[in-house]
């Protein structure tokens, strides 16, 4: 499981408040997938606010990471190519989930998930559902016991190293 939040933050304080709300909701839970922050609302970039979008994303994602969860950014292809252009969106360790309703994803950066349609059908669910491809093994987002040693896999499938905060406990994971 993972988390998705649609942001309405106009400033850094509101981004921090959104992060706190997510962290409070996650208390006692350990999602395997990242906490995806959707910054696509036009109101948050209106009236010159676009210049602060990278700062708001950093505030949110840093708080999510400090609480022991993996942050990610969700947006459609147009936003990644034309709005989320600050280097923090390209060079950060934040996971990317791209929405592009097409037969292929044309995003040239790294991404783990591609939302390819919004009108999918699932038996037992009334109405349309979003359909996604995962380019990572989602089963890797958890603790693994390998040869009597515990590892925690990050979104890229590699063993996490350094300090990790999970379910209210800090762990030191050797490199």
Model-derived features with residue positions:
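Substrate-binding cleft of extracellular glycoside hydrolase catalytic domains
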Residues: 1-70
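Active-site beta-loop-alpha junctions enriched in small/polar residues
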Residues: 6-10, 40-42, 76-78, 101-103, ...
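Extracellular adhesion/carbohydrate-binding repeat motifs centered on closely spaced tryptophans
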Residues: 139-175
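Distinct, well-ordered alpha-helical segments
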Residues: 14-23, 80-90
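Aromatic-lined carbohydrate-recognition surfaces of secreted/lumenal glycan-active proteins
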Residues: 64-82
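Short acidic, gly/pro-rich beta-turn/loop elements at beta-sheet edges
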Residues: 13, 47, 83, 108, ...
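Functionally critical loop-and-helix segments that line ligand-binding/catalytic clefts
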Residues: 87-139
